[in-house]
């Protein structure tokens, strides 16, 4: 499913002395099956923007469309179900006595049949790479990475067509980060899911997304393919961001070895380029 935003403006605490414009005339489209990153410094409007995608926030002005239908009126409730949002530290929202009950919570609220709930929970726990053996355990007995997967399963079990992830690997160790992003990457590739990643990590964005939206002071500063956006290092630095560290390293290396290509975004690309140079040498 696709998302389209036109003329979206959002003002916090409108009409009070604390009024603040968080989004200012945002226009964007995210196509079905895309993997899009949204980056920006703290307070740039990233999280406020994505909370409009499933109606958690309502525009002060402007419109949000899901698959061509405006997120208002009689169809709004059904359209909202198509967008699942996983916020930072989602495991803090785990509360049931078993993993099964936590994952099933949303389905129970929807009034689905017990057999159907059982089938969907088992399917989803496998989808996030966990064993069905943990379904009877307390979620609080699990590791940090497992809790994060269980929390994500609680969203995925509702079968959204669009998955929004706000800093999905925050607080995890390097192994846990890699596992979460491999899970998300597989969901995108194998399930043809539209994925929107909000992140402060330029390395994660460079490695996984196809297109980047750069937010600054409630507006879209840049938008384009990941490689073309990260080439604009000066613009990124002016708004408090940066390209991935490996990009800067390869540019420094090119000063010493002019033959190498410095249009590099990931460690894997850097390894490949250096191996190519060594073979030629």
Curated annotation (Swiss-Prot):
An example Gene Ontology CC term for this record: ATP-binding cassette (ABC) transporter complex
Protein name, as recorded: Energy-coupling factor transporter ATP-binding protein EcfA2
EC assignment: 7.-.-.-
UniProtKB keywords: ATP-binding, Cell membrane, Membrane, Nucleotide-binding, Translocase, Transport
General function of this protein: ATP-binding (A) component of a common energy-coupling factor (ECF) ABC-transporter complex. Unlike classic ABC transporters this ECF transporter provides the energy necessary to transport a number of different substrates.
Locations listed in the record: Cell membrane
Organism: Acetivibrio thermocellus (strain ATCC 27405 / DSM 1237 / JCM 9322 / NBRC 103400 / NCIMB 10682 / NRRL B-4536 / VPI 7372) (Clostridium thermocellum)
Amino-acid positions noted as binding ATP in the UniProt annotation, renumbered to this chain: 40-47
Membrane topology: Peripheral membrane protein
GO molecular function terms attached to this record: ATP binding; ATP hydrolysis activity; ATPase-coupled transmembrane transporter activity
PROSITE patterns, sorted: ABC_TRANSPORTER_1 (PS00211), ABC_TRANSPORTER_2 (PS50893), CBIO (PS51246)
Root EC class: translocase
Subunit structure: Forms a stable energy-coupling factor (ECF) transporter complex composed of 2 membrane-embedded substrate-binding proteins (S component), 2 ATP-binding proteins (A component) and 2 transmembrane proteins (T component).
Gene3D superfamilies (UniProt xref): P-loop containing nucleotide triphosphate hydrolases (3.40.50.300)
SUPFAM superfamilies documented for this protein: P-loop containing nucleoside triphosphate hydrolases
Similarity remark: Belongs to the ABC transporter superfamily. Energy-coupling factor EcfA family.
Domain spans labelled ABC transporter: 3-242
